[in-house]
Amino acid sequence: MQIVFCNKYFFLNGGTEKYLYTIMNYLSAKGHTTIPFSIRYAGTWPSAYQNYFLAPPGDPEQAHLSNIRFSPANILRFLDRSTYSFEARIKLSRLLKAAHGTDIAYILNIYNYMSPSIIHTFKRHRIPVVMQIGDYNLLCPSYSLLRNGRPCTLCVQGQYYHGLKYRCVKNHLSASAVRVAAMYLQRLLGLYQLVDAIVVPCRFMKDKLIEGGFSENKTHILQYPVEPAIEPDETWHKKNYIVYFGRISYEKGLDTLICAFQKLNPPTDLYIIGRSYDGEAERLKALIQPHAKNRIHFPGFQSGQNLTKWIAEAMFSIVPSRWYDNAPLSIYESFLNGTPVLASRIGGIPEQIQECVTGQLFDPDSCDDLIQKMGWMLSNKDQLFQMGTAGQAYVNKTLLIKDHSERLMNLFEAVIADYTRR
């Protein structure tokens, strides 16, 4: 089967790109043809189709919205990419002609940078489209279902004007206006309704999309896969620390974690690992009190064997999200390495963790409840091993890449068969 994968980043930016890299390589090894369509940023992975990629809407060195200088020219490019881009359609058409014989398109994260106009191009070429939705971009101007730092669902059913009223995009009136206008235009054009199937990682996400007007029959739950990239080292063993790994950004609730850790003041260390966004790491460091300064650490971004070692040797990992986190991959990666998880009871997270079996849950944004649950975990270290073992068994039984790819290919085949009957 020949599959075109569409994603705005074709380099390791986060969980979506890790998934993209893994699934493309796995399917290629199984004899399928995988073709990327993306944006040409500095550091983009090599590809024979790179000449067909879109030019960046801003600086090629700056892939993230928070780092882009909004000159008048850049604003116009983002307006084009956020609404309906003919440039994207032309580039994709050229790629499809060069890669003659595409069977299906798999769209991941294209929001604001690539334009959903490419869905029209696939339809013009009679190519069915499957789209993976891993956040709330189609329901919320800010993508996070957060307003003033708290969960918000005002726009879910299409009342996007709230995003302008509350300046939900970067607290910026112009940016919010562009985003809200784009959402109304795309809803009017029905672009996302043309998608043949939608893949989501959890029931919570599916329910939110249905609430927002998407077809229940088209929406399929397919959990994120994990694959052990590195064999565990025999010298690794559990050490006296707790770990968070992932994005260091406001919606991840790390200020609540620091609050609880300092009040509990356990004789252990806390490591917060990842890239910082919008200056969040510096804001968090400013919250650390003198008595905890030597026990709360920020090692920066880690990957590969280094990250695997951090996860495998932790007593447990923490996911303190305050937003409706759909199905954080960090939970499954912790399980994969025999590490139980303490996470907030919000979004799709309760679907991932079986309480007292593979981890524990606490009330989001509740420092007091996190103190209680963290204290329980630290006081029951004998049970942590059992939880880690149970999580590892669950992942190895149901969530490896081979199982995920088999279910994904079955969906692709069903979509193609249905499409050819029309």
Where are the model-predicted features located?
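Conserved acidic donor-binding segment of nucleotide-sugar-dependent glycosyltransferases
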Residues: 355-356, 360-367, 376-381
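N-terminal strand-loop element at the rim of the active site
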Residues: 7-13, 25-86, 95, 99, ...
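Short alpha-helical donor nucleotide-sugar binding micro-motif in glycosyltransferases
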Residues: 301-302, 309-314
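Acidic donor-binding loop of glycosyltransferase active sites
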Residues: 312-326, 339
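Nucleotide-activated donor-binding/catalytic signature segment of Leloir-type glycosyltransferases, i.e.
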Residues: 282-305
